[in-house]
Regions:
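Non-catalytic interface/linker regions that flank or bridge core catalytic/transmembrane domains
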Residues: 1-235, 440, 447-482
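Histidine- and acidic-residue-rich, metal-dependent catalytic cores
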Residues: 161-482
Length: 482
């Protein structure tokens, strides 16, 4: 039962055998209806089937079998699982994502539909309960196995949906503030400070560093979700990524360790001035024109102006936002100031902003491997563009932060479970503790295997797995990772 794919194959074969079995309820599950989402259709059919089998409603096709206690207990369990599945299928985010043209490419929706397929088989198995108690008990073994799989899959679905809803909510909260400021509306920073506290708490709990991304033209998280002006959500995702990085390094800086909220809030607000750059410009895969580049280079100063004008007590934040693209050697923008002229908070933002940007995809390039991104930031610091202290704080994230999906030198795939304490040990970056998820040929491992690569005889981290490859290999089993 641990190998869900194998189980689904057996279910498919079993379903074919059941097609010829006389049914208690004819056509309990309609084939298709353009007006009713398939997940809701199956759920309603399954509920009706269970009610009829357990005698809650009358049926017209002869007497029902007398069910054993075990059969009734399993049907009661099935009803409980069905209620959870129906609730999941009715969530606005799931309904919205299911109605998108590319719904089949969404790992969570694909996973959900496979769960529905297992439930469908459960309906057919329940319909086939015979009169004989001994025969019922044999079928109960199969139904119990299916329900165990459904319970496990529902837990994964619910956990993945909760994470997505949290991501959607965080992006929307920032995007709403950015949109309001762009429309010359006064805003309070209480909601931003609350989000900053959440990110700091995530860092304290050593939760995985997850880089969020939306398209520049995106106006909502899913059809029917909260709508904001473009490119507010795209900018909000990058601001959150930068804030997550700062939340994890601020404790190492003597100046800001005692007041970590300010740097995280500054990171969350640093892109507000970019709202007047058209989404089409940010979505360009080709080089920018001189006018487009000039407009982008004005966004730090414009953001500082918006903060000063529309937010209260924001002078410190405004100074940091105005300088987060300045460089230590004077090659930055908008003012071209250098060295100590740049406030410390601006220099911290610059290092975290650069790292977060490199780790995220852009219309003109894919996301960089986290090791490459960190190396590039350290090189920029070595050449005097970024502050060395703040750049070196990023080493505490390791070349491969906890939660990264990685490919090993022998082709196996896993996720970083922990990094070694001595991050300066040259052997440590490529040899963390990894939870192995797939073999080199893409075969999924039934249960994650934790391996300390520093003690293993083979394998070291080769690279961060690209997003598309991650979805291809892991999406069907681990939608939360894809």
């Amino acid at each position: 039962m641990s190998d869900v794919r194998g189980l689904l194959d057996r279910i498919s074969a079993f379903r074919q055998r059941l097609e010829s079995t006389p049914r208690i309820i004819p056509e309990a599950i309609p084939i298709d209806s353009a007006d009713v989402p398939p997940t809701v259709r199956v759920a309603e059919a399954f509920r009706q089937s269970l009610r009829q089998i357990t005698g809650m409603v009358e049926v017209s096709e002869g007497p029902l079998p007398v069910l054993t206690d075990r059969a009734r207990q399993l049907l009661s369990t099935a009803q409980t699982l069905l209620a959870r599945q129906n609730k999941f299928a009715s969530e606005p985010a799931i309904l919205g994502l299911s109605n998108r043209n590319d719904a089949a490419n969404d790992s969570l929706i694909a996973y959900h539909r496979e769960t529905v397929a297992v439930l469908d088989c459960g309906v057919r198995l329940a319909q086939a309960f015979p009169e004989s108690p001994s025969a019922q008990l044999k079928l109960c073994d199969g139904l119990q196995g299916m329900l165990a799989v459904v319970a496990d899959r529902l837990a994964v679905q619910e956990r993945t949906l909760a994470q997505r809803q949290s991501d959607y909510s965080r992006i929307d909260r920032i995007a709403i503030v950015y949109s309001a400021m762009h429309q010359n509306q006064a805003v309070g920073l209480n909601s931003i400070a609350a989000l900053a506290e959440e990110l700091l708490e995530d860092a304290r709990q050593t939760k995985p560093l997850r880089f969020l991304h939306t398209e520049p033209r995106s106006t909502h998280s899913y059809p029917g979700g909260t709508e904001t002006l473009a490119p507010a959500r795209y900018l909000a995702a990058h601001a959150i990524n930068t804030a997550q990085v700062i939340a994890r390094i601020v404790s190492f800086d003597y100046e800001w360790a005692s007041r970590p909220l300010v740097p995280v809030v500054a990171a969350l607000m640093m892109e507000c001035g970019m709202m007047r750059v058209p989404a089409d410009v940010l979505a360009k895969p080709s080089p920018l024109s001189a006018d487009e580049r000039r407009l982008i280079e004005q966004h730090p100063q414009h953001g500082a102006h918006l903060l000063t004008r529309y937010a209260t007590d924001a002078a410190l934040l405004a100074a940091a936002v105005a300088t987060h693209h300045e460089r230590g050697d004077g090659t930055g923008f908008p003012a071209g100031i250098k060295g100590a002229q740049i406030p410390s908070l601006g220099r911290m933002l610059a290092a975290a902003d650069t790292y977060a940007a490199l780790c995220s995809p852009r219309p003109y390039r894919p996301a960089q491997d986290t090791r490459t991104a960190l190396t590039d930031v350290l090189l920029l610091a070595e050449h005097g563009q970024l502050d060395k202290d703040f750049a070196e704080y990023l080493v505490h994230l390791s070349f491969y932060p906890v939660g990264s999906i990685v490919e090993l030198t022998d082709g196996r795939i896993g996720t970083i479970a922990a990094n070694h304490v001595n991050r300066m040990d040259p052997r440590s970056p490529g040899r963390p503790i990894v939870a192995l998820l797939a073999e080199a040929d893409g075969t999924l491992i039934s249960r994650p295997e934790h391996v300390d690569l520093s003690l293993a005889t083979r394998g070291a981290v080769l690279r961060t797995l690209p997003a598309e490859r991650c979805k291809e290999v892991l999406g069907r089993r681990y939608p939360e990772l894809a």
